[in-house]
C-alpha cells in the first residue's frame, strides 16, 4: 500500500466525487479571520466538522455499553462552537461526504492544533467502498472545558491505495454504517 499525494486526491475528488464538497487548496483564513486550516495537503485531506454535535453526559448514571448504547447519554447541540466538558467527549460529523474507491483505505489522524490542547480525534478507518459522512469523536483529556470549532479543520485523512482490489469491500458486506448522514451512534 502506498500513501497517495495531493495530485491523486484532487483527481479522485474532481473526477470521481471522492470528497464533496472538495477544497483543492488549504483554507487558513475566512473573512480576514484565522481558522484551523482545512482542504488538500501534501499527502492528505484536512476535514471540517459540521455544526451538529452530540455531547456526552452521565446525568443518568448509566454504564456505557457498545452493544446496548443509551442515546440519552448525549445532549444534542447545534452551533459554531461546541464546548466539551472536562474529561468527556463529543461526537460530530464531517462537512465532507466521502466515497472511498474499492482499492483504497483511509486512516484519520488528529490535527496538531487540537492535539496540543489535549483534544484527541478518534475515527476508525474508512474501508474500501464505504460512503457517507464521517462520524468524528473528540475526547477532551483535560480537566478544563474545551472548544471545537464547526466548519474549520479538525482532522486529516490519509489515503492508502493497495496494489490490488480487495475481495470483499464494505459495500459488499453491507456494512452497518454505509451511507450514514448525520452523527451516527453505535450500532450492534
UniProtKB/Swiss-Prot annotation:
Origin superkingdom: Bacteria
Family annotation (HAMAP family): dCTP_deaminase (MF_00146)
Family of this protein: Belongs to the dCTP deaminase family.
Annotated transmembrane regions: none
Keywords: Hydrolase, Nucleotide metabolism, Nucleotide-binding
Molecular function terms from GO: dCTP deaminase activity; nucleotide binding
Pfam families in UniProt: DCD
Residues the entry annotates as binding dCTP: 111-116, 135-137, 156, 170, 180
Catalytic residues identified in the record: 137 (proton donor/acceptor)
UniProt organism field: Francisella tularensis subsp. holarctica (strain LVS)
Listed name of the protein: dCTP deaminase
Summary of the function given for this chain in its UniProt record: Catalyzes the deamination of dCTP to dUTP.
Enzyme's top EC category: hydrolase
EC number: 3.5.4.13
UniProt GO BP: dUMP biosynthetic process; dUTP biosynthetic process; nucleobase-containing small molecule interconversion
NCBIfam families to which the protein is assigned, alphabetical: dCTP_deam
Keyword field contains Repeat: no
Quaternary structure and partners: Homotrimer.
Pathway named in the protein's UniProt entry: Pyrimidine metabolism; dUMP biosynthesis; dUMP from dCTP (dUTP route): step 1/2
Reaction(s) catalysed (UniProt annotation): dCTP + H2O + H(+) = dUTP + NH4(+)
InterPro entries, per database record: dCTP_deaminase, dUTPase-like_sf, dUTPase_trimeric
